[in-house]
């Protein structure tokens, strides 16, 4: 009952500020190989305050966007099931960051581990400025 329509100008202002937001995601992912706590530790160390480059293709044009990953933690849930907590800049395409998006996101979790990682669930836990 407390919902109201958003004006287009308000939506445009919010989208323009998306880079300023810090978003915390919880990602449940399935890996191609079994994953260990050492893999999680190496990801945690590698992705602390790391820039991630994303490429977007629109016809012949290729756009490049740089985003920050501030923190990456995780825990092994099963043999090939892992849960990641990722704190990053608001404009990061999180699914592409996890699976690599066919080389369009570099570095990615799958590229760093050296095997396929497929996100199953993505939840937003927190959004802050």
Positions of the model-derived regions?
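Non-catalytic RNA-recognition surface used by pseudouridine synthases
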Residues: 1-129
